[in-house]
């Protein structure tokens, strides 16, 4: 009687153990170790499958029953070019360094300076160049207008001869219309008083209004920037 009870108890224990393994295996399709919760393998390293195994739904890559699905490659990052932006710059060239007083022929030393400027203006990002001639207020308005035009064209032609494309350069004379030193300099000369000779006052006035005798080179350049859009990072 005692031996029979022991055998019955052992049978119940084995049955319970088998039920537990079967219950776990029915979910995973493989025989799983109750201690490590890992799939049991045979001596050949093969995974043990049970009667509940369904390869289509339960097959695992590590057991050779499924093929790993490669992760999709990240989409290429689109580089967006912004609309061109324009940068304007004015370079003022003193007529004193370019021409003699009341002259429209370039000084020898001015040639080298204009050659350096031409190299810069020949760059592909330079869209347009406007050469403006200016004079002081001395002399008639008509005379000053003509002088400013001649000087502007002399500078523009020199730049073209040094490699600046003629299609991007223009020249205009503005005469004395933008003279800025007139009133300031007249006030300064007046301070010399009655004792100063007329010639001295004229000399002082010519020197004072020198900044008005100039050639402005107005440059418009194109700046195009490439922008990489920021990726959206989703938080889980």
Swiss-Prot record:
Q: Where is the OmpA-like domain?
A: 86-223
Q: Which CDD domains match?
A: OmpA_C-like (cd07185)
Q: Name one GO cellular component term.
A: cell outer membrane
Query: Which residues form the sequence repeats?
Result: 69-70, 71-72, 73-74, 75-76
Q: What else is known?
A: PIII is closely associated with part, but not all of the PI molecules in the gonococcal outer membrane. A portion of the PIII is exposed to the surface in intact gonococci; the protein can be labeled with iodine and reacts with MABs.
Family the entry assigns:
Belongs to the outer membrane OOP (TC 1.B.6) superfamily.
What protein name does the entry list? Outer membrane protein P.III
